[in-house]
Amino acid sequence: MTLRVGIVAAEPSGDVLGAGLIRALRAARPDIEFEGIGGPRMIAAGCVSRFPMETLSVMGLVEVLRHLRELLAIRRALLDHWRVERPHLYVGVDAPDFNLTLERRLRQLGVPTVHYVSPTVWAWRPGRVKTLRAAADLVLSIFPFEGDFLAAHGVAARYVGHPLADEIRPVADPAPVRARLGLPTGGPVLAVLPGSRLSEIGAIGPSFIGAARLIAARYPGLRLVTPLVNAATRERFAALRAELAPDLDWLFVDSAAQDALPAADVVLTASGTATLEALLVGRPMVVGYRVHALTYWTARLLRLVQVRHIAMANLLAGEGLAPELVQGECTAEKLAAAVAGFLDAPQRCAEIGRRYGELAARLRRDTSREAAAAVLSLIEASRGD
């Protein structure tokens, strides 16, 4: 009997996770069919995507409100479809604000549900753990410190490691990657990663470009490289660069961040998966982030944020190895100064690379295989196999 799995991812990092899970499940059970929402990697792995993944890629309270009607319509359409064509299991890949409601309603219909990537309930809006407990039969956790928190709140969870740690290894010598990208093997290289969402690029792109201009003026011969995941983000960031810094020698690469990061001496990045990728490659980073002022002050006033750091590298380390410049601190001048603090201190960079290597080793678990085994066990238990 063919197994049908519903699956939804909302952004590029989720697309990577979802694609790995699909491939691992199909390796174990070739008869499984997948449909829902996914990006190019999930589609290539065999998922039928009923809506473009980009329609779900919005962030922040204000930004979500602007797209709320469309988001609700998509979720309603998926639920209506799966009421008729009921899947044997549903996997929500991250995107908790979209997926948890869908999971809860499908679970009420008797569909076993998995949430792949624990929401950061230990860091942000901890009250969501009740929603998570009601929505998911099983949470697949990708960070080692999450399990104790989830267990204490009655959430069934399994730590599966992080798939990027299986895929990305430290790169000590940047020369081969620079040669492949057409960059000179000598001289400083700064990787600039302004985020994977258009709203992120609009919010922090100008500050990042301003910082790049200041750094280039201080370090003659500096080269800039920016990997961009899709045409929309490339077009948005390229337009900002053309407006604010048309004279800078800047290489845009149509690829994942991990393909360009090893070429860099230092990384200037938005908060998000890119901070983990920089850690896995072993590159020091400066993290900048800014959201709509209403989003930020609402979070502050309601005490929705529970942790000291926003960068995963710092959360894993338990200390601020990567400087974090948030909201009003995220200025071109302060970002540039933080980057210079690394470019001027090779010994500091080497020590951070060593620490990042230790942290990366804790994340390597053959994640997709571990996740697939957990999913198949839940399917078998629900069917009485």
Regions found by a protein language model. Give the residues of each.
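Nucleotide-activated sugar donor-binding and catalytic core shared by glycosyltransferases
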Residues: 1-385
